[in-house]
Amino acid sequence: MNQPRLASGQRNLELTSRVVSAYLSRNIVPAADLASLIQQTYLSLCSTSQADKAEEAAVEEQRPAVPIKKSVTADFIICLEDGKKFKSLKRHLMAKYGLTPQQYREKWGLPADYPMVASSYAQKRSELARALGLGKKRTAPELGSGLVNHSQKMTEAAMQIAEKKVWAHRS
């Protein structure tokens, strides 16, 4: 148990000597203030290393709000940080926790293919994109008719989706 403490103290002494040496190479310090500078630098490094250890312990103790296996359903993804349900998790993670999907996966030990969007939501968006003709190569539109055709396609696609929702709701 004393070994890590000695190693940490030794490390702080080395860092103190480096920091003070670098400071003295660019600044003039009276000899009377030198001892105070060394002491303040050492104490600052010690308090920083203690804060880092406390932070690491807090990170290690954190547990997911729900079991990982239950966090993915067809209709929503449950955030492991706070247990809230979302169709798309990416925006919530960045806004509330400042985490990217990759950082979130690393933090919780999730596989690289762990979804950030509920499967039913992704499927609905894919259907809408296909109905709008996205992903297909455009043909040269006739003068004046291209804009009308595009808006007609959008209206037809929206109507098809609305009809599906009505029939799904009635079933």
From Swiss-Prot:
It comes from Sinorhizobium fredii (strain NBRC 101917 / NGR234). GO terms for biological process: regulation of DNA-templated transcription. It comes from the Bacteria. This is Putative MucR family transcriptional regulatory protein y4pD. The lineage of its organism: Bacteria, Pseudomonadati, Pseudomonadota, Alphaproteobacteria, Hyphomicrobiales. Keywords: DNA-binding, Plasmid, Transcription, Transcription regulation. Belongs to the ros/MucR family. The keyword Transcription applies. GO terms for molecular function: DNA binding; zinc ion binding. Disulfide bonds: none annotated. The keyword Transcription applies. Pfam families: ROS_MUCR.
